Structure formats: C-alpha cells, structure tokens
Amino acid sequence: MDLEREYRAKTGGSARIFARSKKYHVGGVSHNIRFYEPYPFVTRSASGKHLVDVDGNKYVDYWMGHWSLILGHAPAPVRSAVEGQLRRGWIHGTVNEQTMNLSEIIRGAVSVAEKTRYVTSGTEAVMYAARLARAHTGRKIIAKADGGWHGYASGLLKSVNWPYDVPESGGLVDEEHSISIPYNDLEGSLDVLGRAGDDLACVIIEPLLGGGGCIPADEDYLRGIQEFVHSRGALLVLDEIVTGFRFRFGCAYAAAGLDPDIVALGKIVGGGFPIGVICGKDEVMEISNTISHAKSDRAYIGGGTFSANPATMTAGAAALGELKKRKGTIYPRINSMGDDARDKLSKIFGNRVSVTGRGSLFMTHFVQDGAGRVSNAADAAACDVELLHRYHLDMITRDGIFFLPGKLGAISAAHSKADLKTMYSASERFAEGL
C-alpha cells in the first residue's frame, strides 16, 4: 500500500471531521501551517509526550504545541495550578497578583526584563517592540533578518519566505521603513544597515531562526550586529519567542554575552496558554507609560481583553517554577538528547542532509546536488522540501511519530532516549528506501 493510502486507511475519522471543518474554516484550519497533505489528523487528547487522534492512533509528538511545551503535554504542576485558578475565575479584566508572580520569575532569569508588558501572542509582542523602538529613538527604519519570522504584523511580514523580493501577502502596502539583512552574513548585514543612516530605529532578530529552518545565529554575527546598532544609537531587539527558556533557564542572549534593549518572549513562558511578553530596560519601556507620557510622545501598548489573564499567568508561573526547580536536570538532559539527534540523523542520512538546530531543537534538511551546510533561510529553501514532508508523513503513518510535516522537532522533558532510538530506526528504514 502506498503511503497516502495507508495514511487515509488509518485516519478515516479525521478525514470526516476535516471535511466538516472545511465547511466552516478557511482551508479547514485556523493556522496555515497546521494543514498538510492529504489532510491533518484531528487530535482528541494529549498527555506527556503523546498525542491521540480521533481514530485512536497514538503518536510520540515532536511538534509539542508549536515548540511551546518543554515539560510535555498537560504536565501535572501546570494542570494542578490552572485547575485551582479556574475555580476562582479565569478572566477578570482587572489587576491580578498572578501577573506579579510570573513577572518576578522572568525578571530573575532575564537580566534586561526591568519592566514587562503582557499580550496574548508573539505577533503582538514583536509588533509592540518595534513601536517602542521607533518611539524611543524617534526614528523610522526597522531591520529584520531574511527568513526571520516575527508573526503576522504587517510591518514585519517581509522577507520571510524565499524569494525575498516577492511580497508575502496581498493586502500589504510597500513597507519602505522595514528593511531586511542577510542572516549570518555580518559584512552584508552591516552594508544594508549602514545605508539606513541615522534613521535606523532597531534591528529585530532571532538567536535561532525558528520558522526559517531551525538555524542558529553565529555568536560573532550577533555581537557584530549589537556593536553596530548601539554605536549608531539604535536598539537591539531580540525575538526570543522560540528560544526563551528553551536552552537554559533564561534567554539565549546571555550565553552570547549580548545586552539587548528589548526582548520578546512567548511560547514556553505561557505554560501552554496564549501569551506574548515585551520586556526591556527601564529607559526604553518607560515610554509606554500612559500615566507619565502625553499622547504625543508615548508608545501606546494597550494590551488586549485577555492580556495578563489569571489563567495564563498561573500556567506560566507554574511552568517556569517547575523549570527553575529542575533546571539542573532538565536542560542538560534535553540539550544532550538534541545533540544526539543531530549527530545520529546526520550519520543515518549522510551527505543527503544538513541537520540544523541547537539544544533540544533540531531539523533535517534534505540538501540537493550535494549542497553543504544550511546556514540561512535561503539555504533551507533550496532544500528538497517535498522529501522532508514525505519523511515526516512516513513516520506519522508507519511509526506513530509526529513532526508537523516540514517543520523542526522539539524535545521535551517528557521524551526519553528510547523515543529517540525509535525515531532513528524509522529514519533508517526511510533512508533505505531513498
């Protein structure tokens, strides 16, 4: 039986539900990347490292809620804390103490988090970070990296997918005040930034491209960018929505010796609930204070109806509290497992792949025509994406291993070395058929 027929035979219930979903939802989904061919399975439940679909199929999950569930699905400390909060209400629309509890943990782990604001998504967090930078500097130009993904805010939806000179979407105006720099190319980046002159407000960059291919930034590259922007009176904004609390208890920038002005957080810090965090130095964040700043000179960060709701704040504090308590065991273990995954997959597939990532994140790129190391999003886009999708669908169908097809994998505290061995065996079987 061919792969697609085998998948369809195992997921008939999902097929029926997804056909119904297409009657109500554009493309059948509410997030573009959740669709994959021939159709996505429909999840019934999740616990620990497992997803269970409506047909009863059980999967070891490496997607882990868009990489946000570092403790696994529904971990007991988070579940217990949230259940207690739900008995007291989940949105009040007023100030709650749970917000302070989470902020205290973040400040203790993130050196630049002198002040914090909460929103409900990473998109909002980075959008507001850009606004803060413009208001603080009085400048207009925002620079991002080619392949950098910062959510769907119009001003930053630029140069995300190759080819970079083609607009990412209809409905966008020409964003003349947003520019893009080549990731991991310091000389090329400084050339672009230099042409912005004295109107450069900030550079927004990820320490590891998440959506762009799970590609770490060279530390010398990041330090060179920081030195340049600070010498020009501009700000360094780090998008650590993927990397924050992923490799260590805190942010990735600390290991590189960076001193950002603003950091955007999300995913892990919400404990599996919707969150976006803008945090930064006092002198930058203060401009958003509507009590002390008039309309004409403030950066308006209003939040939203559900921002800093007590359910999310409770979940986030519980998740970070558990990570803090177990940081001496969780991080060394899952980072080591990630190192092993990159090493073993590289050996299994040989020169057919470039396996990227850092710590507990990894991604297999099937390179074409003997291309070498994948070091930026353009390199990733030149790989055989269709083969990667087939590899992932093969493991979903035949091995009960779930990667969102085409995306990176995230190892959680719920995974074991035995899980990795099962993935290696599945990969060896797939490699033999190439």
Curated annotation (Swiss-Prot):
It is found in: Cytoplasm. It comes from the Archaea. It is an enzyme of class 5 (isomerase). Its EC number is 5.4.3.8. The modification N6-(pyridoxal phosphate)lysine is found at K267. InterPro entries: Aminotrans_3 (IPR005814), Aminotrans_3_PPA_site (IPR049704), PyrdxlP-dep_Trfase (IPR015424), PyrdxlP-dep_Trfase_major (IPR015421), PyrdxlP-dep_Trfase_small (IPR015422). One of its GO terms (cellular component) is cytoplasm. This is Glutamate-1-semialdehyde 2,1-aminomutase 2. The gene is hemL2.
